């Protein structure tokens, strides 16, 4: 493998990490409040609102059901409006964020559902407002689950970013497609595969350690 290809792979790793973590951050900025809203508006919860819950849940389910490669192509006009181009690192972050947000929202909702109902009832009995319950009970108690959700999301985004590489998003996916598949270079393809596996392993390892650190003893 040439030195130029090695540097290209290094840049591909950097671009993949940038796409993954930036879109993961914005995905959480959108998905976390949506997930909390899904939980608190569920039937029997502290801000029960069946109509809002059904509407929000339907939107989340619709976006979760769209395969990422279809979402990527469908969002090209919107991506051009937002960042001025439909190819490259910045352009990839837009559909990655949109793809991650509903996924995060549903995982956040499920993490909150694991909290014992008795804690919430005790807080309500002491006069806590819904906002106080969310800030002081729900989010702290669900922190291990939320960290696990972040780990799963980042791993999913690594795979999404690789798919995006096939349509010019950059990163390891584009290198594997352009030089490995189109260029019939098995060495490049295998190297990209190994690098993606290593990235996923490191993200999972880091996530597991953080979960252990924040889990209540």
Swiss-Prot record:
Membrane topology, Cytoplasmic segments: 41-67, 114-151, 207-217
Ranges of the Periplasmic topological domain: 1-19, 89-92, 173-185
Matches recorded under SUPFAM superfamilies: MetI-like (SSF161098)
Pfam families assigned: BPD_transp_1 (PF00528)
Subcellular location: Cell inner membrane
Superkingdom of source: Bacteria
Protein name, entry field: D-methionine transport system permease protein MetI
Lineage: Bacteria, Pseudomonadati, Pseudomonadota, Gammaproteobacteria, Enterobacterales
């Amino acid at each position: 493998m040439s030195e130029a290809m090695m540097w290209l792979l290094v840049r591909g790793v950097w671009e993949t990490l940038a796409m993954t973590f930036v879109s993961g951050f914005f995905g959480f900025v959108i998905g976390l409040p949506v997930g909390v809203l899904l939980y608190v508006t569920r039937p029997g919860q502290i801000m029960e609102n069946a109509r809002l819950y059904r509407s929000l849940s339907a939107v989340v389910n619709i976006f979760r059901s769209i395969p990422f490669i279809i979402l990527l192509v469908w969002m090209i006009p919107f991506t051009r409006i937002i960042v001025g181009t439909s190819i490259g690192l910045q352009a990839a972050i837009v559909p990655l964020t949109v793809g991650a947000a509903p996924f995060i929202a549903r995982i956040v909702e499920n993490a909150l559902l694991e909290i014992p109902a008795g804690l919430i009832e005790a807080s309500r009995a002491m006069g806590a407002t819904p906002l106080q319950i969310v800030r002081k009970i729900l989010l702290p108690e669900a922190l291990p689950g939320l960290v696990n959700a972040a780990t799963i999301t980042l791993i999913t985004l690594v795979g999404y970013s690789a798919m995006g590489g096939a349509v010019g998003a950059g990163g390891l996916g584009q290198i594997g497609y352009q030089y490995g598949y189109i260029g019939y270079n098995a060495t490049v393809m295998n190297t990209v595969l190994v690098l993606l596996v290593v990235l996923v392993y490191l993200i999972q390892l880091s996530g597991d350690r953080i979960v252990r650190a924040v889990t209540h003893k």
